[in-house]
């Protein structure tokens, strides 16, 4: 059995699409790492600002003579605010990922507003919680969007010409009778037919196989050509590869939500 030219051509086009999504996936993973670092340090600064504030307030109430003047209260709130503000200005100014995310310039007013608001004691606790929720929502939606692109590569009904005289019809369907309802499969019907005469080509057609929608034949690079007498080998290899890839995506989702 040899591959027809149309099948090889289709696989090449498909591989290019998967390569494109792969690039987006790895760029997204790297972006998540950077953003977690950026926001993690910024949240640490917010916590530091509030700790300073509470320490000064505790000192103001517990020390005799320290709280006799209004200047003491101003001093109490001014010190942690200025300390945190300077730290935020330096930190945000040096962090390109943060500025790109909020689309701000170090010369714009929004830059100073973000620095000042994140430095306000107590008030910035709400900002910290809002940032955490926003990051989770954004990254989770982004992750699912990429995951859907993988699943959407082979939607619909299509024909694969595995050999000169044999074709398999593949249809995107849900795999019933299984607890795993989150995956779709491509069912291949081993209808071995002679194209010219439309009659049965062989009495023992290749057994019915099912294949995951994601990453169809990409990793194998037409490896079935090396296993011409055992097409199921390619299916088994593909299944293991895709399951490994799905586990990585699940880990990314868990990483996002922690």
Swiss-Prot record:
Compartments, as annotated in UniProt: Cell membrane
Keyword Cell membrane tagged: yes
Keyword terms, alphabetized: Cell membrane, Membrane, Transmembrane, Transmembrane helix
Listed GO CC annotations: plasma membrane
Lineage start: Bacteria, Bacillati, Mycoplasmatota, Mycoplasmoidales, Mycoplasmoidaceae
Domain of life, source organism: Bacteria
Organism: Mycoplasma pneumoniae (strain ATCC 29342 / M129 / Subtype 1) (Mycoplasmoides pneumoniae)
TM ranges: 38-58, 72-92, 111-131
Topology in membrane: Multi-pass membrane protein
Protein name: Uncharacterized protein MG256 homolog
Keyword Transmembrane helix: yes
């Amino acid at each position: 059995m040899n591959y027809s030219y149309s099948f090889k051509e289709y696989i090449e086009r498909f591989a290019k699409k998967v390569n494109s999504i792969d690039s987006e996936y790895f760029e997204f993973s790297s972006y998540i790492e950077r953003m977690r670092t950026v926001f993690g340090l910024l949240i640490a600064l917010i916590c530091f600002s509030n700790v300073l504030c509470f320490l000064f307030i505790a000192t103001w109430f517990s020390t005799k003579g320290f709280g006799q003047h209004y200047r003491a209260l101003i001093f109490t709130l001014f010190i942690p605010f200025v300390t945190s503000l300077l730290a935020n200005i330096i930190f945000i100014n040096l962090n390109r990922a943060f500025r790109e995310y909020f689309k701000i310039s170090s010369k714009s007013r929004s830059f100073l507003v973000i620095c000042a608001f994140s430095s306000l004691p107590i008030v910035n606790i709400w900002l910290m919680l809002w940032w955490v929720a926003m990051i989770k929502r954004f990254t989770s939606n982004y992750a699912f969007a990429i995951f859907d692109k993988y699943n959407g590569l082979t939607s619909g009904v299509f024909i694969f010409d595995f050999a000169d005289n044999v074709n398999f019809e593949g249809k995107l369907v849900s795999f019933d009778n299984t607890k795993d309802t989150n995956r779709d499969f491509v069912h291949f019907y081993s209808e071995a037919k002679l194209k010219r005469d439309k009659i049965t080509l062989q009495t023992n057609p290749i057994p019915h196989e099912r294949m995951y929608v994601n990453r169809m034949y990409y990793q194998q690079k037409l490896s079935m050509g090396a296993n011409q007498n055992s097409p199921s080998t390619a299916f088994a290899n593909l299944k293991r590869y895709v399951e490994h890839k799905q586990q990585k995506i699940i880990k990314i989702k868990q990483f996002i939500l922690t």
